[in-house]
Amino acid sequence: MHYMGLNEIREKFLEFFESKGHLRLPSFSLIPQGDKSLLLINSGMAPLKPYFTGEQEPPRRRVTTCQKCIRTGDIENVGKTARHGTFFEMLGNFSFQDYFKEEVIPWAWEFLTSDEWMAIPKDKLFISVYQEDDEAYDIWTQKVGIAPDHMVRLGKEDNFWEHGSGPCGPCSEIYFDRGPEYGCGKPTCGVGCDCDRYMEIWNLVFSQFDADGKGHYERLARPNIDTGMGLERLACVMQGVGNLFEVDTVQSVLHHVEHLSGKTYKQDDKTDISIRVITDHIRSCTFMVSDGILPSNEGRGYVLRRLLRRAARHGRMLGINRPFLVELVETVIQSSESAYPELREHDAYIKKVIGTEEANFARTIDAGMNILNNMIDGLEKAHQHLLKGLDVFKLNDTFGFPLDLTKEIAAEQGIEIDEDGFHAEMKKQKERARAERLKKNISGWSEDLFGGLDAEPTVFTGYNTLTTEGVVVALSDEETLTDAISTDDQAKEGVLVVLDKTPFYAEMGGQAADHGVITGAECSLRVLDVKKTPKGYYVHTCVLESGIVKVGDHLTAKVDKEYRMAIARNHTATHLLQAALREVLGDHVHQAGSYQDASITHFDFTHFSAVTPEELARVQKIVNDKIYESMNVTVKEMPIEEAKKLGAMALFGEKYGKVVRVVDIEGWSTEFCGGTHVKNTAQIGGFKIVSESSVAAGIRRIEAVTGRNLLIRANLQEAMLHTVANTLKANNITSLPIRAEAVMAENKAMSKELEEIKAKVAASKVDSLFDNAEEVGGVKIASAYFTGTTGDTLRGMCDSIRDKAVNPCVAVLVGKTDDKITMAVTVNKLAQEKGLKAGNLVKEISAIAGGKGGGKPDFAMAGLKEETKIDEALAAVKGIVEKQLG
């Protein structure tokens, strides 16, 4: 056995199983695809579940991978010991109803012990098998030749893989004996002991049964193989090191942490914890961001935020009082890019996301820590040990302290937190937000109004027709259900109509509802909005313009064709926009929200910086190019697995059924979508981005117009330009830039002239300023309050005072313009020699009027808040100067 780097070990493993007929697959994303049971991929087998369950056909019966994984179940222990980490890589070889124990056991032994591969001494390896698995035991002892004293039979708890119902089976684990120095010293120490001597490096799982979850097992006709070997653990063996933080690729990151902090690893237990936390967490964060995860307060985004902020806090504990994590990203990339080239492809984006998140936290961490420490001090003085849920909530809401971070910091001081109280406050916040959303809802009715309706769900016909005959199954005036509603003498608003069939699209998926009319023999209604209830009823919010409408009436529902078309233009354009953004900005762009009505579309997407004007121009050009190419837009319903194979983009977090609706634009854009669309991109007419902005951390928004709205907007802008041209007395729009430059030049000249006049006025004021000056300790003191005087003018006056004064002097001047009050203090050189400094004076004097400021020994400024205390502050100047003279 000789030293081997982690990257070399990974490649050797994959090469070995390729030589055994396996297809090498790249690591899957850390984001589970179609598996709601997982937040993050945490094993080599996890992304391959569909192949094991038969939901999908594997690309080959034999597959090998090195899968990046993250586990955060024991995050609070990461750093405290060298055994725990959140990021790891899992080597694996898999058989989908192909080979079984007879092949996989000898292969595992060959890879570990052959001189061509790992060359681990055979006497260092021990094997465990399930106590009833004689087949595996015999293969190990008879075919491979393992001595019985290196074999151990263990029970179901240790050597049987089972997770509820479904495929399961016994497993066989391979252990490496690290030597007695790692052991517990007990006579009973052996494989299965809790000490560190026997380290499990490879688990071979034999899926040969189908469990019903009730203790019954049926043998599978065609069993599977699933193996997993921790790459970092094997690297510990091959490099002869004690733990994962000493493995070469991890060490490179750890050494960088040492360099940034000026601390040395293994010299102080407390320091070591922080170094390990940062080393581990930055590796996880780098890979998570590379796979498109962004910091947030929910789900995997919360995990990322928690890791980043925990690492940032430990940086503070090492004395790194600035954002620094982004500097470690490059080291992580360099150590792993040979196996994960996407890290290098996304390096700028990864650094931007991590840098921005850390900078955001840096702005609040110190204030938050001070508040938390004060809370803990207060508890200790009161001999209490429970931090209130409301206080924990405030730390989260105001300073961005995740619950777990507060919990960890408090635990270090022996303080517990009221988690139930915290969650109660979070629930209240969500309820407040929900109430606000309900206030903004244009319809005042509650979904509960139709909750007891005993009728079939409304049939939506609007994909194929804009006109449908329907029967009224329910009516309401937004307060109660009723059998009939009439207009009396005037139109009646807030009439809610439920039909058995409707062509009206209800507001959902970010698309606004259709408008139109519902008419019958005795009534005419104008439809303003449509909502779909959880039970599937389409509720039309209408104005009853004439007549009477009754339950049971047969009516004609007709959608406004042009209004529907305007929405369709915007919706299809949004699909083109997302594809264009991914092409220009990168594959990390994902939809985070959208809204389309007849006048505008806005699209929210994941991106961590403002989109540059150049990038926006490229995006806009791409969308318009696709419009002018007259691409066909096709809509199909298909099984969800078929849609995924086509590469259809789904909205993250959205729940889909077995059959989905897919909107495809000639393969250039393919998305799951239930909305209405044009049939050809040429019908969009044109696309114009009107704004780009931030709506949340890591979320940008683009607003755009299409079709006739583009022309309307252009006409409005042209009219505005004509108005500006007339105001500036330009001959026409084309000469507007020249005229604007001329006006700016005139304005600049007048501003210069005004400043010269102000300077002369200031000079005249300065000349008389010391006429009635007081004197303290040989220093002349002048103070004055000027209205209509800017800070720049005060600065000029102070410069003039210092230039002209021949004796020690101090001047304290206050100026006010609009609502801004400024104080300026100057101390000439002769007064400085007596120990006076402008910066010290301005701090003490301005504080009287609620001000704050500072500066240099000769000049300082402050902003004042309390105008009523200006006279008091100026009256105190003499005493403060006298005090500071000593």
Map each language-model feature to its residues.
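A glycine- and charged-residue-rich anion-binding loop/surface
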Residues: 1-886
